[in-house]
């Protein structure tokens, strides 16, 4: 049970116990209207793509508003031959819909084959599928995972391209991780590590712009595996994720994006650091907690503040404050209509009450 809870608590940067809900600045109608009036007067695909991206950035956390803009930005980027724009849009859409609308996510993954064909983009295409499957495993979507594993077993490794072999290594490690946790064969978790490590080793032979997305997913999964195996290298892996995120942002020199969300990923990465518990010093735990909370406050994200504070005080042994923050987290989720599986949240809260000797709650 402990391993299942820990896996749920630290399932990559998408926390299933306390799912992030970045509550940043709301959409800005005046700026949005101004950009919308420019569209009919803008025939150039690159310029239209810029407008759609800026509209998406202005949509705040409303996926309902942002998704159509990202789809339009993808179409214009494809017309303009804007590789960064295509990758940015596809990555956003797959990540957002992987656990919300699997068929839609699968559509974007299939679309990447025609929009970004060839070996040069093979690793990026693999990253979309890897992330999608990774999310399905974290969400315990048995049917999807079983189908993917059957396909994986049917592949002849010797006949795979170098890029396909990297994908095979990662997915094999992911499969071992998934089956170990779901069958409670926790001693087998460590067997997944060499596969993901080999995937990373082989990825380093490729240019950064080709490998970046898949490499980030590999580091994220490896951080989970190290964490579950009580390996202190987990911290370094999360740090690599943050570094790659920053490098991806730095690659975008097409136009200014003042409303781009540049901090959400790092906020969640620092939140994940809190789960390292005994693997890092108390000073580092405090440092990562403060970094996460600082970003969350700047974004006005009360859900992240409460949920990460609950984790932090649980880690530091202040169970009374941890329980109080869990209560606040649940209240925010309900008031904001945030979808969350409350069962593991209540299970954690119950565990903390038991640790405090409060058996009435």
List where the protein language model places each region.
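A "functional boundary" signal
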Residues: 22-361
């Amino acid at each position: 049970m402990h391993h299942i809870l820990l896996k749920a608590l630290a399932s990559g940067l998408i926390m299933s116990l306390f799912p992030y809900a970045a509550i940043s600045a709301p959409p800005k109608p005046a700026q949005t209207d101004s950009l919308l009036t420019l569209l009919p007067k803008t025939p150039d695909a690159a310029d239209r793509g810029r407008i759609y991206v800026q509209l998406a950035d202005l949509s705040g956390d409303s996926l309902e508003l942002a998704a159509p803009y990202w789809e339009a930005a993808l179409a214009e980027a494809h017309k303009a031959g804007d590789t960064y724009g295509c990758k940015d849009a596809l990555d956003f859409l797959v990540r957002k819909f992987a656990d919300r609308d699997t068929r839609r996510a699968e559509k974007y993954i299939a679309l990447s084959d025609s929009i970004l064909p060839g070996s040069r983009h093979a690793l990026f295409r693999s990253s979309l599928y890897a992330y999608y499957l990774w999310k399905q495993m974290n969400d315990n979507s048995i049917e999807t995972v079983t189908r993917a594993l059957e396909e994986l077993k049917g592949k002849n490794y010797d006949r795979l391209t170098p890029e396909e072999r990297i994908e095979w290594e990662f997915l094999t490690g992911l499969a071992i991780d998934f089956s170990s946790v779901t069958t409670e064969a926790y001693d087998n978790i460590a067997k997944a590590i060499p596969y993901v490590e080999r995937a990373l080793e082989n990825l380093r032979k490729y240019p950064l712009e080709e490998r970046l997305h898949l490499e980030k997913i590999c580091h994220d999964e490896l951080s989970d595996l190290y964490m579950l195996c009580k390996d202190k290298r987990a911290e370094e892996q999360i740090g690599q994720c943050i570094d790659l995120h920053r490098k991806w942002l730095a690659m975008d020199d097409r136009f200014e994006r003042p409303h781009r969300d540049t901090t959400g990923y790092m906020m969640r990465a620092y939140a994940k650091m809190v789960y390292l518990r005994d693997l890092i010093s108390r000073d580092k735990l405090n440092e990562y907690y403060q970094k996460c909370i600082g970003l969350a406050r700047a974004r006005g994200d009360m859900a992240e503040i409460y949920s990460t504070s609950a984790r932090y005080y649980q880690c530091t042994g202040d169970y009374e404050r941890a329980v109080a923050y869990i209560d606040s987290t649940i209240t925010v989720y309900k008031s904001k209509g945030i979808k969350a599986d409350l069962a593991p949240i209540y299970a954690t809260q119950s565990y903390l009450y038991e640790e405090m000797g409060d058996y009435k709650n």
